[in-house]
């Protein structure tokens, strides 16, 4: 895990599934937990639970695969809004990721949602990450 918690929450499951690992651990922050919840809802990872090691808590999720070849569900991810260049689109400007196959995870005032929910509720927000199959 590096210094970018938002990047770790999508990179760690992708790397774990490419090496055949069943579970992955990421840092426990409010934003990583909410993005992890969205990834579980969208079917990119599964079975979230919390692992305790002493006084530390880590969210742990299982990797999801597709097909007989056990190809990773998260094949591509792209960081849109970066620490040096934040991007805040309105709800009309939130893009549909890869023709609806993928998802964006904008954190909104009501919590982190998918791009479809943000457009439906007419809520804009920062566009940190796009993930697709």
Curated annotation (Swiss-Prot):
Subcellular location: Plastid, Chloroplast
SUPFAM superfamilies listed in its UniProt record: Ribosomal protein S8
GO cellular component, one term: ribonucleoprotein complex
Gene Ontology molecular function: any one: structural constituent of ribosome
Keyword entries, A-Z: Chloroplast, Plastid, Ribonucleoprotein, Ribosomal protein, RNA-binding, rRNA-binding
Biased composition (Basic residues): 67-81
Region (Disordered): 1-23, 44-133
GO BP term, example: translation
Ribonucleoprotein recorded as keyword: yes
UniProt cross-references to PANTHER family, sorted A to Z: 40S RIBOSOMAL PROTEIN S15A
Record's subunit section: Part of the 30S ribosomal subunit.
Similarity remark: Belongs to the universal ribosomal protein uS8 family.
Protein name: Small ribosomal subunit protein uS8c
Annotated source species: Selaginella uncinata (Blue spike-moss)
Gene: rps8
């Amino acid at each position: 895990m590096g210094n970018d918690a938002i990047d770790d929450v999508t990179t760690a499951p992708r790397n774990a599934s490419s090496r055949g690992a069943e579970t992955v651990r990421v840092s426990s922050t409010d934003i990583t937990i909410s993005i992890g919840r969205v990834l579980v809802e969208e079917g990119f990872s599964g079975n979230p639970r919390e692992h305790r090691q002493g006084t530390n808590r880590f969210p742990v999720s299982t990797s999801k695969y597709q097909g007989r070849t056990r190809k990773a569900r998260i094949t591509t991810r792209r960081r849109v809004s970066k620490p040096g260049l934040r991007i805040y689109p309105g709800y009309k400007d939130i893009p549909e990721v890869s023709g609806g196959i993928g998802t964006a995870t904008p954190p909104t005032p009501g919590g982190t949602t998918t791009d479809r929910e943000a457009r439906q509720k007419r809520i804009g927000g920062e566009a940190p990450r796009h993930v697709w199959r």
